[in-house]
Amino acid sequence: MDKDRIVGSAKEFAGRAEGAVGDLAGDAQTQASGKAREAAGTVQNLYGQAKDAVREASETAAGYAKDAYDNSGETFRDGSQAIARKVQDNPLGALLVAGGIGFALALLMSRPARRPPPRWRYYG
């Protein structure tokens, strides 16, 4: 539990009590002050709740990232072994795929730069 939540709850309670005293005494200023303190306490309590939620979400995300990092070596190794098996099973297909990828990359890299369209100006 966050400090802001505790302080906010205390302010909210104090504001309710002050508002009740203002109601009993018939003092509008005390009643308004109590309502203002209650509202401030509610806002601070909500702020503390939001901070707690963000903290929990960041801890969860960090845990997921750590798990993904820990398992990345195994995943890479398994993928490499699967590709090696496919290449051994069908070497001609692997050669054609590699050639196609190389050809596509060569086309992308050797493409001429686009020129801007000519501007036609009328001088008259």
Swiss-Prot record:
InterPro entries membership: CsbD, UPF0337_stress_rsp, YjbJ_sf
Gene3D superfamilies: YjbJ
Cystines in this chain: none
Annotated coiled-coil segments of the chain: none
Lineage top rank: taxon: Bacteria
Segment forming the signal sequence: none
One Pfam entry name: CsbD
Similarity field: Belongs to the UPF0337 (CsbD) family.
Protein name: UPF0337 protein blr1496
Protein's organism: Bradyrhizobium diazoefficiens (strain JCM 10833 / BCRC 13528 / IAM 13628 / NBRC 14792 / USDA 110)
